[in-house]
Amino acid sequence: MANESKCPFHQTAGGGTSNRDWWPDQLNLKILHQHSRKSDPMDPDFDYAKAFKSLDFQALKKDLTALMTDSQDWWPADFGHYGPLFIRMAWHSAGTYRIGDGRGGAGSGQQRFAPLNSWPDNVSLDKARRLLWPIKQKYGNKISWADLIVLTGNVALESMGFKTFGFSGGRADVWEPDEDVYWGSEKVWLGGDTRYGKAEAPGKGDLVAEPAKRPQEQGRNLAGERNLENPLAAVQMGLIYVNPEGPEGNPDPVASGKDIRDTFGRMAMNDEETVALIAGGHAFGKTHGAGPADNVGAEPEAAGLEQQGFGWHNTFGTGKGGDTITSGLEVTWTSTPTKWSNEYLNNLFNFEWELTKSPAGAHQWRPKDGKGANTVPDAHDTTKRHAPSMLTSDLALRFDPIYEPIARRFKDNPDQLADAFARAWYKLIHRDMGPLARYLGPEMPNEELLWQDPLPKAGPQPSEADIAAHKAKVLASGLSVAELVSTAWASASTFRGSDKRGGANGARLRLAPQKDWAANQGLDKVLAALEKIRDEGGNKISLADLIVLAGSAAVEKAAKDAGHAISVPFHPGRVDASQAQTDVESFAVLEPLADGFRNFSKARYSVKAEKLLLDKAQLLTLTAPELTVLVGGLRVLGANHGGSKEGVFTDKPGVLTNDFFRNLLDMGVEWKPTSADNEHFEGRDRKTGAVKWTGSRVDLVFGSHAQLRALSEVYGSGDAAAKFVKDFVAAWVKVMELDRFDLK
């Protein structure tokens, strides 16, 4: 407009070309500083677990049950029941979990934020969450969005006649999107070429939270199969699992079965659990594809302000009810879509199926010869009836040679399906919650499940005198500081803040598979010596506690030898798990394929070593200063894997000095690569040319990266020796106690 006032600002804060635009390969330390107090509106002393315990749980469930059939004009319930919609909401919240790095899942309510709130697979879930707002508003901070989303799915099942296995609360909300999760590199929704084109052949390794850069490959492994990039667990950008029309839209049930096995396996489900989840979930509700997709508007993150967080505005007909467009598929599986039954499997096997298309043009299946006509109700018009229909991914349960006998057994034994679905659903919605110590609420099952990494109950705790005696024996055992520190680190650093698995509690370092991991070679000698000390001391302390105590005693000694008298805090209470309590296959995903804190890498990866270090630090919930001080301290303590001298920038190994930083920042040293791949370096005296040090990428990044160098300068300063020791001890104790939820 001619009379429009000109804004004095062309851009506002945060706009313009960013550092990431200029240097896209730059190490992104921001992932270490997510979810801070600055983004959290709750009071500093707010305790969600305490608030949840004050919740009138049964009253909440009663309100949720009433909501199921309280259809709203602005978003009418299919078949008069919101249950199927809420099941999908809970499933899609939990279903983002993947075992590769433990990220994703329902644990913090991320479905409220980008990108998940705008994924194509989550169309209409904006409506589901908005239907819940009056209930969330009523109960306030006593129930988090994360818990409410999952609980609502459970109540939905119960309201339709299904007996669930239980529910546990304890998922605290966060207030901003996760920035550490790698969802893929595709730039368009539903793209899948990059995640298959980038996948490595077996035995190589493409992992962690940031994409690798390399030429496009064919997306097929050596056996000719689709090979999905790790750690991803979905076949296309913006999907939870598989394309329901079949791989890349190809309606091939057998090929779909292979995709299903891969994706569900990557979220910790075996074949029986997978069949149970699909057959159980598709006992309810329908999909939505009333018209062409070009009737659907922008997703929530791209929609106008007037939409108030809603997205996908639909201009087809009324845009709701019978005119809803979600996936583009128009499928109703059974004649009782709001009642638990075994009809899904009966229909799957009793009809022969032919390919057809939805009103939106998507591939789906109908019974041949017009069978099943008029057996299925319409979701909104009582005068209409339909035949049952299926997705390509449904037919995979019948035509995949592994799924078929499982599905047929469930068809013939409905009680087995009910039990398997109840257990698999419970696993789905709790998989990222960690140990039972985090579970809350009156509906927690009594049965302990192997996938929960069970631990025995703690017995009597060692006294202060017992602790002192064991520390003295450890230090007199002949074990070196490096051996004790590296063993404690190996035990504790398996923890993942993503799914709260791993850690020192349980002493699983001595059990399969951890005892056989490449990263843990040489630790058997230390473990044997510690077990002997424990036994000779009358078993007054668990091995799990003793491993940590021994490492902490070594840190105290190393600090004392550097002239700093400091006590490393130690809290007993850890227990020793048995091999029977340890699922070898489940724990295998915790193996450190690379651990920059120990200068260890099992193989060469397409991801740079410093990015693997950053990924590890984020999983350990470390800040950038904690990352920095730990690497510097572990190097001078000699904790490198296999006794490697790379990064040990000190002539006093085993003494807790700030020498790593002082020598890395020494301008008298010139660094040059010694390998063609720039993985290894040597530092030479600028005057004499003599080699003084050798280092890895992980070591040199602390002098190269501007932020890490700034932190290194703090710890390398002349007056920083005491601060370095203090900060190292604090970060050390943090890692040692990451899995001590009993202390929090």
Curated annotation (Swiss-Prot):
Keyword presence, Heme: yes
Site (Transition state stabilizer) location in chain: 88
Keyword field: Heme, Hydrogen peroxide, Iron, Metal-binding, Oxidoreductase, Peroxidase
Entry annotation: catalytic residues: 92
Reaction equation(s) it catalyzes: H2O2 + AH2 = A + 2 H2O; 2 H2O2 = O2 + 2 H2O
Cross-link (Tryptophyl-tyrosyl-methioninium (Tyr-Met) (with W-91)), chain numbering: 241-267
Superkingdom per UniProt: Bacteria
Cofactor(s) named in the record: heme b
Protein name, per record: Catalase-peroxidase
Functional summary from the UniProt entry: Bifunctional enzyme with both catalase and broad-spectrum peroxidase activity.
Gene3D superfamilies cross-referenced by the UniProt entry: 1.10.520.10, Peroxidase, domain 2
Processing and modification events after translation: Formation of the three residue Trp-Tyr-Met cross-link is important for the catalase, but not the peroxidase activity of the enzyme.
Cited PROSITE patterns: PEROXIDASE_1 (PS00435), PEROXIDASE_2 (PS00436), PEROXIDASE_4 (PS50873)
GO molecular function terms attached to this record: catalase activity; heme binding; metal ion binding
Pfam families: peroxidase
Source organism (scientific name): Pseudomonas entomophila (strain L48)
